[in-house]
Swiss-Prot record:
NAD(+) binds at M324, D343, I400, V401, E402, K407, S429, N453. The keyword NAD applies. The gene is fadB. Residues 311-729 are annotated as: 3-hydroxyacyl-CoA dehydrogenase. This is Fatty acid oxidation complex subunit alpha. Heterotetramer of two alpha chains (FadB) and two beta chains (FadA). Substrate binds at D296, N500, Y660. Gene3D superfamilies: 1.10.1040.50, 2-enoyl-CoA Hydratase, Chain A, domain 1, NAD(P)-binding Rossmann-like Domain. In the N-terminal section; belongs to the enoyl-CoA hydratase/isomerase family. In the C-terminal section; belongs to the 3-hydroxyacyl-CoA dehydrogenase family. Residues 708-729 are annotated as: Disordered. It comes from Escherichia coli O157:H7. The record marks E119, E139 as: Important for catalytic activity. GO terms for biological process: fatty acid beta-oxidation. Its EC number is 4.2.1.17, 5.1.2.3, 5.3.3.8, 1.1.1.35.
Length: 729
């Protein structure tokens, strides 16, 4: 053994060839600060070996290196800029020394090589991969950019266009694409990986392969003509501006850095990467996006723990076809759980099957599946008008009309047709689960399972625990939701549960702004362009459906009369009374026409101003700051109340539900992350300016207490140790 660290070791293989093996405790390898330091020590040992002829890098895990240790990021990002810069210089010196070894090097890459894992293998001369490879640089999705030389080496290896596509979008690619663009030199079966890598290494040692020529372009300026450079970087900057926008500075920073570094050799280019990385790491956007990643891991880990002793349902059923029922049926079947889809009429069943077939055909058109796979999936969706086969069902989700009497009757009837251990769930969006459970003989086998539309796109499923729902019931539906590729978050029962309960105060803030004379067009523009929502409130109401929102608003008002009951007619009432139901009938706040692709395109409609004038004060202008404050304060206050009342368990789960269920702008990280970034004391000062607007603007007592000491909701993060300590971590 030449060297042994906690996460990697170095040993001789044969005749002057050494192997460096990543083998961290646990199931995956991560390129954390300790591993970077250990890698530097191992390379130091290699540099002393006069008889070294070649080096093989490999992993003892199912994945090569999944990336940097993101749990370290928040503390690393708190160290002063100069100190973070020093540590990056140290880390890059390690990869430079790997790249500069006086012998050929090869990485045998299996599974994932992401972020720092990808940057590590970019420093070797050759890369051989297995078919399950996923390789790329996802850093821009975390609000940063590659910091271990990825923005320098990848463009010089692949050319500017391919590298920019991966780096700016935070993409990873599979084995075939990696081979096509030159990111790997070959792909072999897993059992042949080491044998194949050794064969390439021997050829390089023997002079049959010119490894020095392979290495040289990575050390030099990027080979691009002036015209090529102008085209590549201009197109990339245009694409980034269109897709990422001003709220996500990392992608455009990465593109500009690669452009600026193109004319330099490795050392100067790495210095530019360092100078760009460090300021990004100190942005609120990076902290928020890293926070989302960590919260996502926490939520998934919680679901995994909850379901460890539960068998995933093998047969499901959906009550109610149509768009929602068809979407749930498709998602279940697509992920391998057969589903019976029951409705009371043929037309609805046909609509449900058409929805599922449409989604499968999109997969076919994109080349994700072939005709055989399509036929196989669709054959596992069984449409029916009766309860045939329900005795085999493990879980049933009801997705019928949002009417408590109808839901109770259908659920009670279904309970008599299934096994005593079958779980029943309702896809209701607002009706309390404990109320629906009153109609059942086995309420312990019942819970809520709130999907979001469109089902195939929206990652969140709210799992609602009723007063009598058993732990096993909750675990079974969490297991099914996870199997469907969704992110299940368990909440306790109340009107609207979590997501809709906090959404309707936001809509109430919108209605009050309109009542006071604000223009809905400006509100939409401010909330989209300035705050960052994917849709402004008027547009969102049109998509949800004005009729749906009108009904849900009444349910919420009955559930929380002290805050959500109103004594005036608002914009939603006015549009509902005028039969303007939004996108579904082409008229809402906006007027909708189909574009060339058959998708609804919104246009202005002067008629809506006359309707709104009946329920509004004369038009007046509001500042962007006031619009954002008046829209967000009711939502944030309600989010805090849900945490204080135990409706949602943690700030992490609340923020993920908002991001995944409502499209809360990820660069803010969720309501609690936004609140922490703003500071609870500053938030209280802002909210108190608007408390005259009513109970929705009154800050909950728990938040007031935090504001007295400006306490955050997330646990405070300590800065990482000084850079000298990090080097030897």
């Amino acid at each position: 053994m030449l060297y042994k660290g906690d996460t990697l070791y170095l040993d001789w293989l044969e005749d002057g060839i050494a192997e460096l093996v990543f083998d961290a405790p646990g199931s995956v390898n991560k390129l954390d600060t300790a591993t970077v330091a250990s890698l530097g020590e191992a390379i130091g040992v290699l540099e002393q070996q006069s008889d070294l002829k070649g080096l093989l890098l490999r992993s003892n895990k199912a994945a090569f290196i999944v990336g940097a240790d993101i749990t370290e990021f928040l503390s690393l990002f708190l160290v002063p800029e100069e100190q973070l810069s020093q540590w990056l210089h140290f880390a890059n010196s390690v990869f430079n020394r790997l790249e500069d070894l006086p012998v050929p090097t090869i990485a045998a890459v299996n599974g994932y090589a992401l972020g720092g894992g990808c940057e590590c293998v970019l420093a070797t001369d050759y890369r051989l991969a297995t078919p399950d490879l996923r390789i790329g640089l996802p850093e821009t999705k975390l609000g940063i950019m590659p910091g271990f030389g990825g923005s320098v080496r990848m463009p010089r290896m692949l050319g500017a266009d391919s590298a920019l596509e991966i780096i700016a979008a935070g993409k990873d690619v599979g084995a075939d694409q990696a081979l096509k663009i030159g990111l790997v030199d070959g792909v072999v079966k897993a059992e042949k990986l080491i044998e194949g890598a050794m064969a390439i290494l021997r050829q390089a040692i023997n002079g049959d392969l010119d490894w020095k020529a392979k290495r040289q372009p990575k050390l030099e300026p990027l080979k691009l003509s002036k015209i090529e450079a102008t085209m590549s970087f201009t197109i990339a900057k245009g694409m980034v501006a269109q897709t990422a926008g001003k709220h996500y500075p990392a992608p455009i920073t990465a593109v500009k850095t690669i452009e600026a570094a193109a004319r330099f050799g490795r050392e100067e280019a790495l210095n530019l990467e360092n100078k760009s990385f460090v300021p990004l790491a100190h942005t609120n956007e990076a902290r928020a996006l890293v926070g989302i990643f960590l919260n996502d891991q926490y939520v998934k880990g919680k679901a995994k723990k909850l379901t460890k002793d539960v068998e995933t349902p093998k047969q499901a059923a959906v009550l109610g076809a149509g768009i929602m029922g068809g979407g749930i049926a498709y998602q279940s079947a697509w992920k391998g759980v057969p589903v019976i889809m029951k409705d009371i009429n043929d037309k609805s069943l046909a609509l449900g099957m058409t929805e599922a077939a449409k989604l499968l055909n999109k997969q076919l058109e994109r080349g994700k599946i072939d005709g055989l796979k399509l036929a196989g999936v669709i054959s596992t969706i069984h449409p029916t008008l009766d309860y045939a086969g329900f005795e085999r069902v493990d879980v049933v989700v009801e997705a019928i009309v949002e009417n408590p009497k109808v839901k109770k009757a259908v659920l009670a009837e279904t309970e008599q047709k299934v096994r005593p251990d079958t779980v029943l769930a309702s896809n209701t969006s607002t009706i309390p689960i404990s109320e629906l459970a009153n109609a059942l003989e086995r309420p312990e086998n019942f819970c809520g399972m709130h999907f979001f539309n469109p089902v195939h796109r929206m990652p969140l499923v709210e799992i609602i625990r009723g007063e009598k729902s058993s732990d096993e019931t909750i675990a079974k539906v969490v297991a099914w939701a996870s199997k469907m590729g969704k992110t299940p978050i368990v909440v306790n029962d109340c009107p609207g549960f979590f997501v809709n309960r906090v959404l309707f105060p936001y809509f109430a803030g919108f209605s009050q702004l309109l009542r006071d004379g604000a223009d809905f067009r400006k509100i939409d523009k401010v909330m989209e362009k300035q705050f960052g929502w994917p849709m402004g409130p008027a547009y969102l109401l049109d998509v949800v459906g004005i009729d749906t929102a009108h009904h849900a608003q009444a349910v919420m008002a009955a559930g929380f009369p002290q805050r959500m009951q109103k004594d005036y007619r608002d914009a939603i009432d006015a549009l509902f009374d005028a039969n303007r139901f939004g996108q579904k009938n082409g008229l809402g706040f906006w007027h909708y026409k189909e574009d060339s692709k058959g998708k609804p395109k919104k246009e202005e409609d002067a008629a809506v101003d006359d309707l709104l004038a009946e329920v509004s004060q004369p038009k007046r202008d509001f500042s962007e700051e006031e619009i954002i404050a008046r829209m967000m304060i009711p939502m944030v206050n309600e989010v805090v109340r849900c945490l204080e009342e135990g409706i949602i368990a943690t700030p992490a789960e609340a923020d993920m539900a908002l991001v995944y269920g409502l499209g809360f702008p990820p660069f803010h990280g969720g309501a609690f992350r936004w609140l922490d970034t703003l500071g609870s004391a500053k938030y209280l000062d802002m909210a108190q300016q608007y408390q005259h607007l009513g109970p929705l603007y009154e800050v909950p007592e728990g938040l007031r207490n935090k504001a007295r000491h400006n306490e955050p909701y997330y646990p405070p993060v300590e800065p990482a140790r000084p850079v000298g300590d990090l080097k030897t971590a």
